[in-house]
Amino acid sequence: RMLHDPRTRRMAEQFACQWLHIRGFDQNDDKNEQRFPEFATLRGDMYEESVRFFEDLFRNDGSVLDLLTADHTFLNERLAKLYGIDGVSGKVWQRVSGMQAKGRGGVLGLSTVLAINSGASRTSPILRGNWVYETLLGEKLPRPPADVPQLPESVPSGLTARQLIEKHSSVPECAKCHERIDPYGFALEQFDPIGRQRPDAVDTRTQLADGTRIEGLIGLREHLATERM
């Protein structure tokens, strides 16, 4: 069967990674080298994790729900350190279980997804939220008005990324679309621009457009898995 031969990897890259907009992530050079000097070394590992995750999903006839709720991933020592996970040593890739208890699990916890939907120096709740809305849920937003001001690449002093976005999104002509996508992104603010969990707690509580209150990746995953899939 095709799902048990080398073509499975091509399916993982050409279908799954293409669908998630992470194909070719191992060549990504969008991050600020001064802020994230480790990124150039890690991006290949981050991409390999995603490919192996999808290879495993296909080989085991995983469901759409497994995309969100999978409790395992594949790590080597270098990527495990980025994730703050002990017990993985060397270059050999290992299947690691219990990812939900470690604050990750499924595609929402993949560093490729979190990093590709961030800026060079800061996170982007708008990009992350739009990715959930359009890529995972298959919804579509109208194009933003042409005269919308660009957000700064770095967060101004005294503001968090969330506060910056909330200020931007309060503009009346922008609010209608942003209320649909931004809350999904706010729920993922515990992760920095390269998909690493922040050392300090971040407010990830948010209210979706339909009034549902969620908190963090766990709350977002539960909502998507039970209400939207």
Model-derived features with residue positions:
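A cross-family structural signal marking well-folded subdomains
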Residues: 1-131, 142
